[in-house]
């Protein structure tokens, strides 16, 4: 019997890579994403490759839509073998430049609260041997100007994942958190396009191919001892530097590695 993978944010970027790779491994794939047009395109592309896939339009920050998505999956009498919590958003902007609290709330609700609510909602469909993968970020391991909300939510996901892992060990469900670096995805290209000018100073940010990073991440979702997955070499270096160097030196180096705004 085929296994089933449910992937939030699976219609494009890293999420679509996960869908495609797991489909090749004979998983039935269920995609949750906001945009019905993107979902249809993703499903058609997967089916062209012989992958069994379905899609559900769902904004994970909306509790009613999330409940409806759960009911739709449950009605198929399907157990979830791999739950991938990948949906997220980023707005590169100084905290002081936000003019509406609704925009702040949307990022918190999507990246952090929505991910937690999705995990809570679909936990009843997981069983012994199931896996959960949460997509955090290298920015979940440090703070960068222009990413106050993104860094806060991604850091929260790391601690959430660690706590959830310990809660589910007794049930034989493994939890992993990946912290990828910059990847060449539609979301990253839009992020760069909308970044304020001060963030575009210095050398262009180095990106990794999403398909390569996705395969690396999935290949490491094995065993109960593994938890934090760092597919990018620059993120691994950040972790090593943070452990080895005194905090003062670490901050000195990071302050000079990343752009900083000019005082107004």
In which residue ranges do the predicted regions lie?
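SDR active-site lid
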Residues: 166, 170-233
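Conserved glycine-rich Rossmann-like NAD(P)H-binding loop of the short-chain dehydrogenase/reductase
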Residues: 27-41
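Residue(s) in the substrate-gating loop at a strand-loop-helix junction
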Residues: 137
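Conserved glycine-rich cofactor-binding loop
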Residues: 11-12
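Conserved mid-core segment of classical short-chain dehydrogenase/reductases
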Residues: 90-105, 146
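Active-site helix of classical SDR
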Residues: 119, 153
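The beta1-alpha1 cofactor-binding region of Rossmann-like NAD(H)/NADP(H)-dependent oxidoreductases
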Residues: 36, 57-68
């Amino acid at each position: 019997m085929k296994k089933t993978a449910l992937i939030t944010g699976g219609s494009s970027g890293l999420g679509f890579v996960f869908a495609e790779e797991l489909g090749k491994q004979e998983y039935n794939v269920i995609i949750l994403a906001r945009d019905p047009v993107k979902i249809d395109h993703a499903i058609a592309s997967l089916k062209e490759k012989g992958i069994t896939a379905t899609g559900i339009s769902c904004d994970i920050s909306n509790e009613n839509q999330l409940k409806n998505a759960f009911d739709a999956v449950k009605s198929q009498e399907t157990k979830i073998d791999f739950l991938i919590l990948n949906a997220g958003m980023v707005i590169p902007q100084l905290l002081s430049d936000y003019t509406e609290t609704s925009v702040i709330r949307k990022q918190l609700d999507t990246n952090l609260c929505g991910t937690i609510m999705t995990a809570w909602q679909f936990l009843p469909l997981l069983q012994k041997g199931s896996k959960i993968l949460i997509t955090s970020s290298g920015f979940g391991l440090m703070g960068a100007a222009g990413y106050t909300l993104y860094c806060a939510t991604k850091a929260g996901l790391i601690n959430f994942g660690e706590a959830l892992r310990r809660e589910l060990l007794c049930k034989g469900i493994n939890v992993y958190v990946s912290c990828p670096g910059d990847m060449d995805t539609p979301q990253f290209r839009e992020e760069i396009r909308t970044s304020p000018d001060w963030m575009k100073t210095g050398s262009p940010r180095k990106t990794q191919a999403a398909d390569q990073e996705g395969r690396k991440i999935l290949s490491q979702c094995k065993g109960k001892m593994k938890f934090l997955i760092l597919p990018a070499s620059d993120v691994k270096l950040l972790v090593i530097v943070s452990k080895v160097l005194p905090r003062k030196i670490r901050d000195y180096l990071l302050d000079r590695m990343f752009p900083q705004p000019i005082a107004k």
